[in-house]
Every structure is written in C-alpha cells, then in structure tokens.
C-alpha cells in the first residue's frame, strides 16, 4: 500500500498535469509528468523524481554531462524536499536511485566510445563526438530508453 495517493499528489502540484503514460518522464513543453503505474513505493519515488524535474525548471540540455547533472539534482530534490513531505525516508545512496543514475552514466559512456578505436571521445555538439586518439568523428542518436546508435562520419 502506498503512503500517499495520486489525488493527493495532484492536489499538491496543481500547476502540473499528471498523466498515465508508458514511462516515467517530464515534458516541460506541456508541463506534464507521465507515470507508468503507481503500484509500489519505488513507483512513487520515481514519480517524485519526475516532479522534481518540474519544480527545478529542467528543460533541455546541450551536452550530455548536463543531463547527468539534471538527473542528480532532481534526485537530490526528491530525496531532500519531496520525500519527507510524504513521510518517505530516502537517501541518495539507495540502490534504486543509484541504479537510475548508473543507467545515465552508462548511457553517457557508451555514447562517448569511439566506434573506430574504442577510446573515450569528447562531445563536440549535442549529437556528435570526436576521438582524441584516432581523430574519428561520429554522430549519436538521442536514445535513452532504446537502442543507442553511433554513426561514424569521419
């Protein structure tokens, strides 16, 4: 049983739309937080994390490292500000939170690997990287929850 109801959360954040969706996510354009299901405390914590993105004004990012910072700050806000409001005791060290952060760190690392030599490259633009080892360049897609693709361009 959840410690708080969805109607209570909707009441507490009238400026946001909360809608059932396929994945937990925040859409800044429509001011909508999407949630998969709310069957467990982990689901509730994930919902609070997405609400944290909204409360922190998170929108777009230009460099992948900015996404990592946004994710970390949203988790910190959920842990320090939102969870206590609903009687939840969370820590940044919780396995679920670290697993979520690890998934973004792993995603970032995979994007940065040179498809030519395997060295870690440097991000040049929002969707391209350069290898400092072999000087290859590659484009990446924006996939975070599906298959990451890298396309060598030089």
What do these predicted ranges mean?
Residues 1-43, 54, 58:
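Active-site scaffold of zinc-dependent metalloenzymes
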Residues 35-38, 65, 121-122:
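Short N-terminal micro-motifs specific to bacterial/archaeal maturation
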Residues 66-95:
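Post-HExxH zinc-binding segment in Zn-dependent metallohydrolases
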Residues 85-94, 98-154:
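Pan-zinc metallopeptidase signature
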Residues 49, 53:
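Histidine-centered divalent metal-coordination motifs
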Residues 57-65:
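Substrate-binding clefts and substrate-entry loops adjacent to catalytic sites
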Residues 8-12, 81, 96, 100:
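Residues that form generic nucleotide/phosphate-binding pockets
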């Amino acid at each position: 049983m959840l410690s708080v109801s969805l109607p209570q959360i909707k009441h507490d954040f009238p400026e946001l739309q909360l809608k059932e969706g396929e994945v937990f996510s925040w859409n800044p354009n429509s001011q909508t937080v999407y949630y998969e299901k709310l069957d467990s405390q982990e689901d509730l914590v994930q919902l609070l994390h997405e609400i944290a993105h909204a409360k922190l004004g998170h929108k777009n990012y230009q460099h992948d490292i900015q996404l990592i910072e946004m994710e970390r700050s949203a988790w910190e806000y959920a842990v320090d500000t939102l969870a206590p409001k609903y009687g939840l005791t969370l820590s940044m060290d919780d396995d679920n939170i670290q697993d979520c952060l690890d998934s973004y760190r792993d995603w970032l690392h995979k994007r940065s690997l040179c498809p030519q030599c395997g060295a870690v490259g440097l991000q040049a633009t929002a969707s391209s990287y350069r290898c400092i080892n072999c000087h290859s360049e590659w484009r990446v897609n924006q996939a975070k929850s599906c298959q990451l693709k890298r396309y060598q361009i030089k």
